Amino acid sequence: MTLNNQQLTLNCDMGESFGAWKMGADECVMPFVDMANIACGFHASDPNVMHDTITLANQHDVEIGAHPGYPDLQGFGRRSIKMTNDEITNMVIYQVGALQALCKAQYTDIGYIKPHGALYNDMMQSDGVFLAVVKAVALFKVPLMILASKENEKYLEIADDFDVPLLFEAFADRLYQDDGMLTPRTQPNAVLNSEHAILEQVRMLAESGRVKTASGQYILLEADTICVHGDNNESIALVQKIRQSLYTGGN
């Protein structure tokens, strides 16, 4: 059955290998997701990986999203880098433009933009960084994917000034705080490791738009899409179960 009268989609970070270094199992997880967030070369990926991931997404009719991050290969883009807002705007334009060019070489295009790691977190914590990202996204005339939270309306108002649609996402495997933000990875239990806990969080999001927070409270999250990860055999199997639960109600 379709839950909540509006089917939640599944998105996944992909194309994060580069050179001889292998990251993730894109070939295995791509058939089970709706949207592929493809790294653009700064936190991970390279032109060949980007090309191959675009090809793979096209083969499975998966929507392509640009996944720009800070220039931090060693830290996988999870370290915040101090930049001016103009520098952030230009950095995002540069990365998205590279992926868009590789898409056009295969007669396709990007469908949305989702920042990565520390840039994503900074965007959700600083209106200035959010505005800098929105200005970049506006040039590509696609939606921006951000974290669903209690402040959805605030972000909608800012983005609307630049005619940028927003896609709100929730995370299948992350523990939430009472304010709707993700528990920092530096804190214990920030990532849900139990298959039961992850499937239960997805079920609640689909049926009632709620999640249980670290303190035990239940909060509303108005999300359009759920982020999943497919880094190993166990996580790929879990993505399959998540997809089944969304499309069949777990039956």
From Swiss-Prot:
Q: What is its EC number?
A: 3.5.2.9
Alphabetical UniProt keywords: ATP-binding, Hydrolase, Nucleotide-binding
Q: Which reaction does it catalyse?
A: 5-oxo-L-proline + ATP + 2 H2O = L-glutamate + ADP + phosphate + H(+)
Name the InterPro entries for this protein. Answer: Glyco_hydro/deAcase_b/a-brl, LamB/YcsF/PxpA-like
Q: Which GO terms describe its molecular function?
A: 5-oxoprolinase (ATP-hydrolyzing) activity; ATP binding
Pfam families found in the cross-reference section: LamB_YcsF
Gene Ontology biological process = carbohydrate metabolic process
- Subunit field text: Forms a complex composed of PxpA, PxpB and PxpC.
Write out the function statement from the record: Catalyzes the cleavage of 5-oxoproline to form L-glutamate coupled to the hydrolysis of ATP to ADP and inorganic phosphate.
Family designation: Belongs to the LamB/PxpA family.
Identification of the protein by name:
5-oxoprolinase subunit A
Which organism does this record belong to?
Answer: Vibrio campbellii (strain ATCC BAA-1116)
